[in-house]
Regions:
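Sec/Tat signal peptide C-region and signal peptidase I cleavage site
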Residues: 18-24
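Alpha-helical cap/lid subdomain in secreted, periplasmic
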Residues: 100-236, 248
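Conserved catalytic region of serine esterases and O-acyltransferases that act on ester linkages
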Residues: 216-312
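Bacterial N-terminal signal peptides
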Residues: 7-17
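Short polar catalytic/cofactor-binding loops
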Residues: 32-37
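Positively charged n-region of N-terminal signal peptides that target proteins for export
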Residues: 1-5
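Conserved SGNH/GDSL esterase-like catalytic core that processes O-acyl groups on lipids
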Residues: 38-129
Length: 312
């Protein structure tokens, strides 16, 4: 009897010490290609230890930026990446479905090839079909599946290069055409909860004078080049803007709340004015279609940028 009483006391004490059970992190899987893993920039292997690369290629990319942003505002996300360069959603459905459906993800972010269809630029048919297939597979694993499609950024080579599919049109035209394709795909299944406006944010940055609109003829003084050396993939600034838009779309947090001293931008070589300008662009784009609550900017820290805290 005495033994049982002591055991009961010890059990009660131990439970009290444990305290409330911490809520599980929100799981997010990013499915994409070089536009997600950050080809052509320092973003590709940035903080790769903070995300799970399901293909074991050691890449951080935009998912690692997203993870960093969430940590800085006190949010807990378990972030994973599954990518293959030069592919669309069709490749992942055909070759990686068993990997993708290994767990019931809370949120999945996916995008296809940058021209909608590598063989038929501007044609959304394959995107629509394979987005539906992906949605069905995710729902079979998780009845509450939440798939977000990402309307990718426009390409300078496809718009200004004479062999480009959008040659003779504007960079905004390509962004609009790509967005229209993703809007069609989003209508294919109720599992698809929305389209993240990455391409439109890029065009907004150009219209606002933050970024240059044509990297093929050089970069205007005082403006950012969102493309890297091949005029196809993004620069650090381009991927950074994409990361901010994804961050706001998934968390509904004002990107400006990260402040001009945001540590990942600092580590990747962006200046405080550049970081603030890109955050403002992301906010202006997101507020058009998301219930983003404006951050009290006057309360942001004014300290000089510092390195990000170690991964946890």
């Amino acid at each position: 009897m005495k033994y049982h009483s002591i055991a009961a006391v010890l059990l009660t004490t131990s439970l009290a010490c444990i305290g409330p059970v911490a809520e599980a992190a929100t799981s997010v899987l990013f499915i994409g290609n070089s536009f997600t893993y950050g080809h052509g920039s320092a973003v590709r292997y940035y903080r790769a230890d903070t995300v799970r690369d399901l293909n074991r290629e050691g890449q951080g990319g935009v998912p690692a930026l997203f993870k960093s942003f969430t940590q800085q505002v006190g949010l807990d996300y378990d972030v994973a990446i599954e990518t293959r360069g030069g592919t669309g959603i069709d490749w992942h459905v055909l070759n990686r479905l068993s990997v993708i459906t290994q767990q019931p993800w809370d949120i999945v972010v996916a995008h296809g090839f940058s021209t909608l269809d590598a063989k038929k630029p501007g044609n959304p048919e394959q995107l629509v079909q394979t987005a539906l297939q992906l949605a069905q597979a995710l729902q079979a694993k998780n009845p509450k599946a939440d798939l977000r499609l990402e309307a990718t950024f426009p390409r300078a080579d496809e718009t200004y290069g004479p062999k480009g599919a959008w040659y003779g049109k504007t960079i905004g035209d390509m962004a609009k055409d790509v967005r229209a394709g993703y809007d069609l795909a989003a209508k294919s299944s109720p599992v698809i909860k929305g389209v993240i406006p990455v391409g439109e944010a890029w065009v907004r940055a150009m219209d606002a004078g933050v970024a240059d609109s044509n990297s093929l003829d050089g970069t205007d003084a005082g403006k950012l080049n969102l493309w890297t050396y091949d005029n196809y993939h993004a620069s650090v600034a381009g991927y950074y803007l994409k990361g901010l838009v994804v961050f706001g779309a998934l968390t509904l947090q004002d990107p400006r709340s990260l402040g001009g001293n945001e540590c990942s931008g600092f580590e990747l070589g962006l200046s405080v004015p550049q970081i603030k300008a890109l955050e403002q662009v992301a906010y202006e784009q997101l507020k058009l279609s998301y219930p983003i609550k404006p951050a009290p900017l006057e309360n942001l820290a004014l300290e000089s940028p510092q390195r990000c805290l170690p991964a946890r």
